[in-house]
Amino acid sequence: MPKPLIASAVAAVLAVGSIAAHAQTKGQPTLPDGKGKQLVEAMCSGCHALQLIPNSSGYTREQWRELTSYMVNMSGSPAQQNEVLDYLAANFPPGDTNRRPAKPVPGKLQLTWKEYVMAKLGQRTRDPIQAADGSIWYAGQFGNLIGRYDPRTGQTREYDLPPKSMPHTVQLDPKGRPWFSGNQNGTIGWVDPMSGKATVWKMPDPEATDPHTITFDKNGIVYFTFQAANRIGRLNPETGEIKIVKVAEQRSQPYDIKFDKEGTTLWVSCNARPCLLKVDPATLAITEVQLPRPRTTVRRLDIAPDGMVWYVNSGAGGLGRLNPKTGEIKEWDSPSGPTSHPYGIAVLDGGVWYNESGVRPDMLVRFDIANETFQSWPIKSGNVYSGILRNARITREGTLLIHQTATNRVIEVIPQKRGAM
């Protein structure tokens, strides 16, 4: 059971110094004055930017209670809990406080949502992926863990990782082993599901400190990106050999990485420049593909069954497609506009699915490839709409696995079959 947040813990944070000065030092906003302000700043700023509070869509007191319950356990301090909830409900109610409203697009397709709440509070659950036995692996980035959830039994097992790993993702190799990227300690590793033991490789390049996204070839060779370090890496787990190359253009911020359908070429997204990177897995030689819109940055990409490379234009608020054979590029504006910041993406059953993380609520969008039309849905987490989808994956059953980081949720999205529409 999670331990209650007691008064001394909050007092220790407050004793560090002026919370307002601390917020200004970190470039965080000053929240409205009132009873409860210091408690909110103390508890919230330790895990996330305070800006997320005024940037939310606003909630009732009961919704704030539910949302905070996924982050911290205040049951042992009811007076403090009431003070926090009263402050949040009074200053950030639903409706008129939403600074970033979404623009939903109605349509005929119906979805069924299955929500699974992971165990450790405040872990920032992300990047769920289905294993061969139907279980779901996920990364708890802020909890410094990866976990396995069995939808059939409801049982969860979470595996603590080496200190300061802060896993940015979890990925399964051809043997079904769960790998993680040590995003804050410069490591790549995998966990034995039976013993919980982690096998870890430290990056030999002292500047390659932030392994990000992982993929594998059919032989189990590991390929991965470094966003801040501006690098791409390869690990042979059998020999331990690691090769790391630097992207020529500074601040490209290589982010997502996936093989094409033939398994012969790697595609990498650039999160700070208008480009995609084509990578030779044998040599790690990089060829840059320029994207047309100057404000373009790309969080993630996916490869369609026909080999097309689909990507989210996070910087300009769009969806794009690259034909790798002809070089033709086409883009569409996302429904919620240029600041909608599309993020995760997956191609499924004639549609491209992605989310609009820059608006509230976070919207799940489907683009129909044949008709070039959109439909979108707010992503709900329990009785609140809160969090960001950072990666999307497909199950063997043809459903979509997504998540909401703020509420420790893995969500299975089941689209209605076309014939039933």
Locations of regions flagged by a protein language model:
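Beta-strand-rich domains and repeat architectures in extracellular enzymes and scaffolds
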Residues: 114-145
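Short loop/turn segments that connect beta-strands within beta-propeller blades
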Residues: 150-154, 192-196, 236-240, 280-284, ...
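The canonical Cys-X-X-Cys-His
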Residues: 40-51, 84, 88
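Beta-rich, blade/repeat-based domains predominating
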Residues: 121-133, 163-175, 206-219, 249-264, ...
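Blade-level signature of beta-propeller repeat domains, shared across WD40, Kelch, NHL, RCC1
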Residues: 385-421
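C-terminal capping alpha-helices of c-type cytochrome domains
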Residues: 74-101, 352, 400
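Electrostatic cytochrome c docking/interface patches
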Residues: 21-39
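Conserved beta-strand positions in repeat-built beta-propeller and related beta-rich domains
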Residues: 137-142, 178-184, 222-228, 266-272, ...
